[in-house]
């Protein structure tokens, strides 16, 4: 695949310190990606974005992704809730030892699966998935199951 300095390979263990905008909350996120086909955004606004693609030179806003964002409160996670279409609640899922609520919805033309929960260290983690299969045994599921907090 073509190289892209804005989207380096995410192969193996990725450790990112997430920051909740406007607060002192931080969270050290550890997530392991497959050896091929996953890339991450080189720039961070306190989040981590992972992209499954064969060509990191062509990553666009509507492409499949898994995004990890730390927010200061549930109100920040639900900020755009009134804009969501077709919201359906999901069975909670334990990620990194934390039970998270789940939902699916359409927003800005994209379908999303989102898991969110309060972190023991403070703040709320939102994991937003679009265009990535997270059914049991898939790469997306393996990535979510690899999450730990440092």
What are these regions (language model features)?
Residues 14, 69-73, 98-100, 113:
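Residue-level detection of beta-strand scaffold positions
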Residues 65-67, 90, 128-134:
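Second-shell loop/turn segments in exported
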Residues 74-77, 81, 140-144:
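Extracytoplasmic/secreted envelope proteins and their assembly/folding machinery
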Residues 78-124:
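Signature of long, low-cysteine stretches enriched in small and polar/charged residues
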């Amino acid at each position: 695949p073509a190289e892209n300095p804005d989207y380096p390979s995410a192969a193996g263990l990725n450790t990112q310190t997430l920051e909740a905008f406007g607060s002192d909350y931080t969270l050290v996120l550890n997530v392991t990606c497959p050896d091929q086909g996953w890339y991450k955004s080189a720039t961070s606004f306190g989040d981590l974005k992972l992209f499954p693609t064969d060509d990191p030179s062509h990553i666009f806003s509507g492409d499949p992704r898994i995004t990890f964002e730390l927010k200061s409160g549930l109100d920040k996670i639900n900020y755009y809730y009134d804009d969501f279409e077709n919201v359906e609640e999901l069975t909670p899922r334990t990620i990194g030892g934390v039970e998270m609520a789940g939902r699916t919805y359409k927003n800005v033309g994209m379908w999303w699966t989102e898991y969110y929960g309060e972190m023991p260290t403070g703040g709320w983690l939102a994991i937003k998935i679009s265009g990535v299969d997270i059914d049991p045994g898939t790469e997306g599921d393996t990535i979510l199951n690899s999450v730990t907090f440092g």
